[in-house]
Amino acid sequence: MFIEEFEIESITSTHLLEVLTREYPEVRSPSIKGAMRWWFRALAGSYFGDDAQKLKEIENQVFGSTKERSRVKISVTPLSSPKRLNLKEFKDKNVGYIWFSINLLGKRGTITHYYPPGSRFRVVLESPSERVIKLATLSLWALVSLGSVGFRSRRGTGSMKIVRASSEVLEDLGLTTEFNSIDEFKDSLKRVLDVTGEILGVKNSETNKSLPSYATLKFSDVEVFGPGKNTWEVLAQFNNSYKEYLRRRIKKYQRIIFGLPRFKLRGVRKDLRRASPLWFGVVEIGGKPYGRIIKFFQSTFHPEVRSKHIVDWNVLSNFDWFISSRLPVTKVWGGWSG
């Protein structure tokens, strides 16, 4: 049995929706496993073009499905207790635009607790297969280093870092849990994608040049900006830039590219859902907080929204130009050539 143990610390506050059967919400194994599956697809999908069926087969071999058991056991133990939500604490932090729904649901009582920055969690991965434990470890690394956890996780909440790892796998794979420079962060992105291909036994072939219908790291842009004086400054800088871009730099109908629902958009049903292809979080580089922006480009935005007039991926990519005019932005990955 291969066992890998990690201690993870929150960089930004982590918010979870209430579960009726619990006194307060917790970061639990199913939520971490679900997030790891997403990032596995983003890594492995970079090698399969638009072959969603093949990607699903590989994913099920690691995480299981309704027809086959998962080959990796994921255990999550909170080492910190959640704190009761006090909306006044966030009132002067200048994050009202990107965290508007936290304020809304907090007032309704749908969100009552959260994990403040500095909260810690233990994550243990177990598998009888060395190949599976490596792929699961890569997925967890990507989740922590590139993604986030919880409600509004694509807008700055739930950013994490690995503070301790009892893991021979990470060392064997040549991945670090601390980034001493932007170049080291950049090299790590290339490394995690290369190693994924090596373990899967596939290459980034010539047939994998067109945009797939699902999100992959290959067809994404990754930028960082900063450093900020503190995490709240980084969050506020993105909040202000994002708000300015959506409200004053693009037309209302063009906002659709940043996710659904959009309740005041003609011709688009209000009940349609589509998670934003733009992920914003905070990453520590050289011990300082940096904003991290990832934009995932796909061939299909939503099966019921096909109009190129409404869905314009250039609106998403042009956000780079806008935020670069306001903040010191460094591109660390550029897989999108559209």
From Swiss-Prot:
Keywords, alphabetical: Antiviral defense, Cytoplasm, RNA-binding
Q: Name one GO cellular component term.
A: cytoplasm
Please verify whether the record's keywords include Cytoplasm. Answer: yes
Q: Name one GO biological process term.
A: defense response to virus
The yes or no answer to whether the keyword Cytoplasm is present is yes
Q: Which InterPro entries match?
A: Cmr1-like_C, CRISPR-assoc_prot_TM1795, RAMP_III_fam
Subcellular localization is given as: Cytoplasm
Task: State the Gene Ontology terms under molecular function.
Answer: RNA binding
Q: How does it assemble?
A: Part of the type III-B Cmr ribonucleoprotein (RNP) complex, an elongated RNP with Cmr2 and Cmr3 as the base, with Cmr4 and Cmr5 forming a helical core along the mature crRNA (39 or 45 nt in length), while the complex is capped by Cmr6 and Cmr1. The 5' end of the crRNA is bound to Cmr2 and Cmr3, while Cmr6 and a Cmr1 subunit (Cmr1-1 or Cmr1-2) cap the 3' end of the crRNA.
Reported function: CRISPR (clustered regularly interspaced short palindromic repeat), is an adaptive immune system that provides protection against mobile genetic elements (viruses, transposable elements and conjugative plasmids). CRISPR clusters contain sequences complementary to antecedent mobile elements and target invading nucleic acids. CRISPR clusters are transcribed and processed into CRISPR RNA (crRNA), formerly called psiRNA (prokaryotic silencing) in this organism.
In which family does this protein belong, per the annotation?
Belongs to the CRISPR system Cmr1 family.
Under which name does UniProt file this protein?
CRISPR system Cmr subunit Cmr1-1
